[in-house]
Amino acid sequence: MDVTHESLSGLEIPILKIHQGQIANGKYCAFVIGRQHPGESNGSHVLKGSLDRILSGEEFSLKLLKHCDFVVIPMLNPDGVIAGNFRTSLFGKDLNRLFKAKDTTLLPEI
């Protein structure tokens, strides 16, 4: 896992890169985000099940990884999770609505 970003409060936001062999041009890349809305805890369970399947080594997962790389952020909004917020970050913003935001000081998660 890489940690390339921190949340507003300084918590690490890990990034998991899953690929078979070298990351290659011409392959699809799926970008998967979990816990963008902190109150949607069921998303963590779905993401874990999905990762278990992708990493299972089964025929399906091997075929999938042959054609697609994955970049996974298991918890995009750790501040909101710890604060007990339902939809918002520590700053009170819904990160789902701010992907075009340019303010990396107040919205480092994006």
Where are the predicted features?
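Non-catalytic propeptide/linker segments at domain boundaries
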Residues: 1-3
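Active-site/substrate-binding loop(s) of hydrolase catalytic cores
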Residues: 6-19, 24-110
